[in-house]
Amino acid sequence: MADERFLAQLWSTIQARRDDPSAERSYTRQLLAAPAKARRKVVEEAYEVAEAQQGLLAGQDTREHLALEAADLVYHLFVVLASAGVAPGEVYEVLERRHGAPPRAGTP
């Protein structure tokens, strides 16, 4: 499933890890227990996205590497949102308001 529906699945997985005490060894759960570490990972991954994009535009990197770094950023951003109790749907609503799109029903 290589489309936006996977984001809902990713969000569900992050919530499941948060709510499952037996998942204590899960990387996601470790990040949720250490919000400062999760925030640092967002900053780190954002920098890596910028570096990969710069390298790609200079012909020194690949689209695949940029996509990999972007995926890491999205994952870590979702973890930060989950730790703060902010659902992706709240972010989607802000984006839709900014771009004048009608709200979609049933977004996570």
Describe each model-derived feature in a short phrase.
Residues M1-A70, V74-P108:
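Flexible "arm" and connector segments at domain edges
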